[in-house]
Amino acid sequence: MKNLFIIIFTSLFLVNCNNSNPMMKQWSNKSLEFGGVPAFDKMSPELVKEAMLKGMEISLSDYDKIANNLDAPTFENTIEEMERSGKLLSDVYPYYGILSSNMSTPEFRKIQGELAPKLSEYSSKISQNEKLFERVSAIYNSSKINPLEDDQQRVLDLTYKSFAMNGAALNNDKKKRYAEINLELSKLYNDFSNNVLHDEENYVTYLDESQLDGLSDGFIKSAKKIAQDKGFEDKYAITNTRSSMDPFLTYSTNRALREVVWKNYYSRGDNGDEFDNNKIIAEILRLRKERVGLLGYENYAQWRLQDRMAKNPENAMALMEAVWPAAIARVDEEVADMQKVANKLSNSKITIEPWDYRYYAEKVRKLKYDLDSDEVKQYLQLDKLTDAMFYVAGELFNYKFIALEKGRIPVFHEDVNVWEVQDKSSGEHIGLWYLDPYARQGKRSGAWATTYRSHTTMDGKTNVLASNNSNFVKPAPGEALLVSWDDATTFFHEFGHALHFFASNVKYPTLNSGVRDYTEFQSQLLERWLSTDRVINQFLVHNKTGDPMPKELVDKIKKASTFNQGFETTEYLASAIMDMKFHLTDPSNIDVDKFEKETLDDLKMPSELPMRHRTPHFGHVFSGEGYATAYYGYMWADVLTSDASEAFAEAPGGFYDKDVAKKLVDYLFSPRNSIDPAEAYRLFRGRDANIEALMRDRGFPFK
């Protein structure tokens, strides 16, 4: 069964619909090339709303037909038919996703608020369809005696578990309450997201020319353009997004302004006004606990992790607690180094505060490693990084990316570009890759990857339509877009997700789903190719001279590879541990701000830095359920990443070794969710991963 609860991130097949609404017509473009593509250029909120409602109606009819089939249940007449159902809705979801994440407006947010409860009701009607579950159960029980083909058995097992985990076996009263809770949660998730977006759009810091000391020319030009676009001709705008906040805190010499920008960013959703998220979070936690209580679980984390690699919250916490002491010990060392620098540079004695950390860390980097992040940035051009990713994809996956001319493929914004993906050897078409790189009003913060259509072979081979989305500050006209090393790493990370989509070799749509603490592994692994010699020597060239990065600078980067790992690991772990602890505690009378503070105190969280995501804007966890009690998954996946990286490092051909690359594709990328992740990793590595490689990577001691 398609994962009915995160269907917003999937798309499957095409549908003919005799309706004037272009959102409800078969995906098409000139000559129906590339299997047809979404009509992004024809989107409007009202059209998408109409299509979503119709899609849900048709999909429910599809499921009812399956449930009411009088023939004895079989894999073919039940599970396969479920895999085929909801074609229109699957096609409409990309439009809904774009208007939610990339092109949000007040008009659409109102529609989103109307649709959220309807989507919840839609999911509940399927997951609580007794006749449908009876058919699935009959096939599942039969398979225990007469197992199906491996991929069929996997789909069946996932489908049965999805029903069971979502209340299909409850009595009618409990089913009713379960559905009511889902409905309430859907509204709260929508409100949470809109509140964060409000604060990101409305808390902008405007500077005058006297307040620009320390900032790069490129950043200043971008800030000027943003301010002009917002109607402030003689100002410079620092938007309330990470891509704007991070470089400002790193380079601005104005400590008072750093504090303002820092507080704006880390107070999103926590300003004590109508857009404050604390009461929403408390209610989300209470409802989640009540819902899993109906199923007999003690807490939400126990319910959620049963089908993850970690299996239970105890294992997830054990990993994080094993790394935490080394991380905060490293922070103490980093702060001591920064304090020495601050004492030398400041006329008056200061104590390192969170808005100082990035600024003084950069000073220490220069002193300790003679490494200037701004100097490195001159070699990190977004277009060259894109070429570098294509090169890596060619070497590992045998892919070729061909830029398509503007206007050939409909896009939702002029900044979006599209490439065709082909097999280098055969020329076989694999899919299309969309890139939406820049921040804009109405676009959610962060970086992400998604698919508009996934690969399957159930009813003929489908191509993949995948996208990467970033929030880089758009450069001034004629200027190169230069990014930080961290942002370049994130760019590679998200492209790793896209390659995971393109490499899929599964028959059934459900098998494109993922196990949350495994799906970040492939993307984190691809980050490692950014620092390979081939990428550095061929693609990291100076934006003015075109000269390759000098060896001396490369050596400095590699020598400083574990620099600031205390900060990076601690800010991440604090958020991941907080996520888990929120879902392990009794939320009956919880005060969210107080719980956050007390938990950080118990952890002995260094006061000089914040969590990566403070609770009131922790969208991974509270704008939906995708990462709820799952933020630990990045570290779980990083254990695999560090271990797998050593497999390449030890190979004769290094990170471009053809034999290891083939195993990478065959066992870690192509199967998607068709085999158990732990088994897949053992097929690749010959054993389970261990934590030692992770600790070595971060320069942490390990006993």
Locate each region found by the language model.
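Sec-dependent N-terminal signal peptides
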Residues: 4-12
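C-terminal motif of bacterial Sec signal peptides marking the signal peptidase cleavage site
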Residues: 15-16
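Short His/Asp/Glu-rich catalytic/ion-coordination signatures at enzyme active sites or charged loops
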Residues: 32-47, 96-115, 138-180, 239-279, ...
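Active-site-proximal, well-structured secondary-structure segments within enzyme catalytic domains
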Residues: 151, 155, 187, 194, ...
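Catalytic Zn2+-binding segment of zinc metalloproteases
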Residues: 298, 496-508
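Short pre-active-site segment immediately N-terminal to the catalytic Zn-binding motif
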Residues: 473-492
